[in-house]
Amino acid sequence: MAIINMTDLDLQNKRVLIREDLNVPVSDGVVTSDARLRASLPTIQLALKKGAAVMVMSHLGRPTEGEFNAEYSMQPVVDYLAKALDCPVRLVSDYLDGVDVNVGEVVVFENVRFNVGEGKNDEALSKKMAALCDVYVMDAFGTAHRAQASTHGVGVYAPIACAGPLLSQELDALGKALDNPARPMVAIVGGSKVSTKLTVLESLSTKVDQLVVGGGIANTFIAAAGYKVGKSLYEADLVEEAKRLVANARSRGGDIPVPTDVVVASEFSPTAAATLKSVADVTDSDMIFDIGPDSAEALAKIIEQAGTIVWNGPVGVFEFDQFGEGTKRIAQAIANSKAFSIAGGGDTLAAVDKYNIADKVSYISTGGGAFLEFLEGKELPAVAMLEKRGA
C-alpha cells in the first residue's frame, strides 16, 4: 500500500490536524471507558515530539448534525487528554474559519458532527478543514469505513494526507491476518444474527481453513443441520443460506461444525436456570444461550492448533455467567495458542476484558463496523483516499 506514514514525515513547525476516534462513553461529564483515548495518546505525543502545532478532531455519539448539544460536547475528552498528556489542552468551538495554535500546543475541535455536511462528506466543509493544516493525519480506524468530511474529504484537499501510527498498526495487523495468514486459519464469528454477518461469513468461508460460528448465528446453523432450536433466536429464512455455506466449506475440505451439546434455559434473564443438553434433545420450549463443554472443548482443540485466529463475536450470552463458559473456554484457547490472533467488535472486546486475555491476543482491533467491513473484503473509503494521496 502506497500510504504515507506520519512517522516518516518532518512535522517541525507544521500545523498538524489529526482525526482520531475519541468516541467514548461519557456519564455526568466524565469519560467512563478510556480505551480509545489511551490508544490515541502515542500519536498525539509523537506529533508534539516532532515539533508540530497539534489539532485533534473526532465525533462523539450521534447528535443531530449541525446542532450544538452539550451532551455530546468534547469537553470531557479534553479534560481527560489534558491530564493524560500532562499539558494544557484547549477546546475550540469555532474552528472552520481558522485556528490560533502554537507549536507544542494541543487543541481539540468541538464534535465534528456539529458541522452541517459532516455525514455527507460535504466538499465545502472538507476544504475548510483542509485549509486549517499543513498535514492531515487519519488515525481513526473505527471510522475508516465512512466517507465523511473529517475522515475522507479533508484528506482529499489537505496539502499532505497520511496515516497515523494507530491506523497503520491496524492495517498491518489485519493484512497479516487476512492477506498472508499462517495456516491453518480459524475464524470465530459470533453474535446474534446471520443476516448482519452474512457477507462476513461468505467472505471468510473462502479464506479460512475452519469457520466456527457461535451465539444466535449458530442456532440458524443448528436448525440447518435438522435439529430443533425451540424458542431460541434464529433466522428461519436463512436456514437454506446456512446449508449452502456448510456445503461450500465441505467441498473445500473444511466444515462449519455445529455444537453437539448446548446450554439452555426457559427464559432470558440474569437469574435463568441453565440446563446442559445434547443438541438432539432441545425441546420446543428451550432457548439456547451457550455451547456445552464438549463443543467448547472440540472448538478449543481447533483453536489451539491454528496458525492464525480471527475472533469476532462471543459464542454465548457471556454477560450472564451461567451462559459464559463457552466463550470463556474459547478465550482461554486463544490465549494459550501460539497463533497470530486478532480480535475485534464491541462484544468481543468486552469478552477479552472479562476473561482477562488482552495481553495474550496479538492484536485487538479498535474498529467495530470498520473491522467487519475489512473482513468482508470491502474497500474502506478513508484507506482508499490515503492510498490515492500516497501514490
Curated annotation (Swiss-Prot):
<dbReference type="GO" id="GO:0006096">
    <property type="term" value="P:glycolytic process"/>
</dbReference>
<keyword id="KW-0067">ATP-binding</keyword>
<feature type="binding site">
    <location>
        <position position="36"/>
    </location>
    <ligand>
        <name>substrate</name>
    </ligand>
</feature>
<keyword id="KW-0808">Transferase</keyword>
<keyword id="KW-0324">Glycolysis</keyword>
<dbReference type="InterPro" id="IPR001576">
    <property type="entry name" value="Phosphoglycerate_kinase"/>
</dbReference>
<feature type="binding site">
    <location>
        <position position="113"/>
    </location>
    <ligand>
        <name>substrate</name>
    </ligand>
</feature>
<dbReference type="InterPro" id="IPR015911">
    <property type="entry name" value="Phosphoglycerate_kinase_CS"/>
</dbReference>
<dbReference type="GO" id="GO:0043531">
    <property type="term" value="F:ADP binding"/>
</dbReference>
<dbReference type="InterPro" id="IPR036043">
    <property type="entry name" value="Phosphoglycerate_kinase_sf"/>
</dbReference>
<dbReference type="GO" id="GO:0005524">
    <property type="term" value="F:ATP binding"/>
</dbReference>
<feature type="binding site">
    <location>
        <begin position="59"/>
        <end position="62"/>
    </location>
    <ligand>
        <name>substrate</name>
    </ligand>
</feature>
<comment type="similarity">
    <text>Belongs to the phosphoglycerate kinase family.</text>
</comment>
<dbReference type="GO" id="GO:0005829">
    <property type="term" value="C:cytosol"/>
</dbReference>
<feature type="binding site">
    <location>
        <position position="146"/>
    </location>
    <ligand>
        <name>substrate</name>
    </ligand>
</feature>
<protein>
    <recommendedName>
        <fullName>Phosphoglycerate kinase</fullName>
        <ecNumber>2.7.2.3</ecNumber>
    </recommendedName>
</protein>
<dbReference type="Pfam" id="PF00162">
    <property type="entry name" value="PGK"/>
</dbReference>
<feature type="binding site">
    <location>
        <begin position="21"/>
        <end position="23"/>
    </location>
    <ligand>
        <name>substrate</name>
    </ligand>
</feature>
<feature type="binding site">
    <location>
        <position position="197"/>
    </location>
    <ligand>
        <name>ATP</name>
    </ligand>
</feature>
<keyword id="KW-0963">Cytoplasm</keyword>
<dbReference type="InterPro" id="IPR015824">
    <property type="entry name" value="Phosphoglycerate_kinase_N"/>
</dbReference>
<dbReference type="GO" id="GO:0006094">
    <property type="term" value="P:gluconeogenesis"/>
</dbReference>
<comment type="subunit">
    <text>Monomer.</text>
</comment>
<comment type="pathway">
    <text>Carbohydrate degradation; glycolysis; pyruvate from D-glyceraldehyde 3-phosphate: step 2/5.</text>
</comment>
<keyword id="KW-0547">Nucleotide-binding</keyword>
<keyword id="KW-0418">Kinase</keyword>
<feature type="binding site">
    <location>
        <position position="319"/>
    </location>
    <ligand>
        <name>ATP</name>
    </ligand>
</feature>
<feature type="binding site">
    <location>
        <begin position="345"/>
        <end position="348"/>
    </location>
    <ligand>
        <name>ATP</name>
    </ligand>
</feature>
<dbReference type="GO" id="GO:0004618">
    <property type="term" value="F:phosphoglycerate kinase activity"/>
</dbReference>
